[in-house]
């Protein structure tokens, strides 16, 4: 969603190091940190995400980006939330935005079903985007800027 050029690939855990990018819209800008994905037991040191969890402590908000092609998006969201909570319960008190990404890869009906599942689970609006086609990104950025201000 920013001008950063992180590696993009069709497999999990493409991000191996935090990537910072700047989002600019009109006269506003903000820094977005793309942190490597968390796996179950990351708070215990498993996977790459653990060593980057400290970066999340400094963030104003958390954007949960979930791959819409995941079979169980609810489990994916809950795994991330659980790991953040196990690392530091205060992190889960931050502003949250939930995003389903890669929406160019599956049909609209399946996206709608998964979006409803996550909205029921999180009680939050879920944004659907494709960072490849750009679909939905502008709406997401508008929401991020509203929360920031």
Where are these regions (language model features)?
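Conserved G1/Walker A P-loop phosphate-binding module
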Residues: 1-46, 50-61, 66, 141-144
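Conserved C-terminal guanine-recognition region of P-loop GTPase G domains, centered on the G4
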Residues: 25-27, 50-128, 138, 144-147
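N-terminal, positively charged regions that mediate nucleic acid binding
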Residues: 134
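Cofactor-binding loops of NAD(P)H-dependent oxidoreductases
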Residues: 11, 129-131
């Amino acid at each position: 969603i920013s001008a950063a050029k992180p590696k993009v690939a069709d497999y999990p855990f493409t991000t191996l190091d935090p990537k910072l990018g700047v989002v600019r819209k009109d006269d506003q800008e903000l820094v977005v940190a793309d942190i490597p994905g968390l796996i179950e037991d990351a708070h215990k040191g498993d996977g790459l995400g653990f060593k980057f969890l400290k970066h999340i402590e400094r963030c104003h908000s958390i954007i949960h980006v979930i791959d819409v092609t995941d079979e169980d998006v609810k489990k994916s969201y809950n795994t991330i939330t659980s790991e953040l909570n196990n690392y530091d319960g205060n992190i889960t008190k931050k502003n949250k935005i939930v995003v389903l990404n890669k929406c160019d890869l599956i049909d609209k009906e399946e996206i709608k079903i998964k979006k409803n599942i996550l909205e029921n689970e999180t009680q939050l609006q879920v944004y659907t985007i494709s960072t490849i086609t750009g679909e939905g990104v502008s709406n997401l950025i508008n929401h991020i800027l509203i929360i920031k201000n």
